[in-house]
């Protein structure tokens, strides 16, 4: 990475994979108890990575961040790391809670959306077609677990309410016999999940 230009770094920028890697490392640190040496090494190496990704990355790549947060993997990673009291860093915790609150803020409500079936879906700019975003919902769930873990029960209730609303929105993507009549092979598509509300593409993930 040190030999790459800033343009090359930007082209390789991803919200997903660093958080996913840190979640994997957290699982190793917390659960692979048969290898104490590895656990110590993982903790030592992960702390500066978390510090950089939470506090420094936004300074270098602020223009790549969108209004609707995209870092659900990192939210899950921080929730898992919080099982270790030494990793209950205020900056990490605030990152999760602030991103979750921003997701909720950019979620259509029944009495505040262009169409009633947008309820529970997310948007970048108000008026967008809604995004029934399961990946971001994983970040919301992580925020709920983290709030419970830290005994912030009012906050946990707020996040759980948002999770339930988002889950109802996700159900609209479920393909059953009532909605697959136009498919070439309805028997094959039944019980699948659509990629988007307005597309009949099936998600294989």
Language model: regions and residue ranges:
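Residues at structural and domain junctions
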Residues: 7-11, 39, 60-64, 122, ...
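Active-site lining segments of carbohydrate-active enzymes
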Residues: 2-34, 58
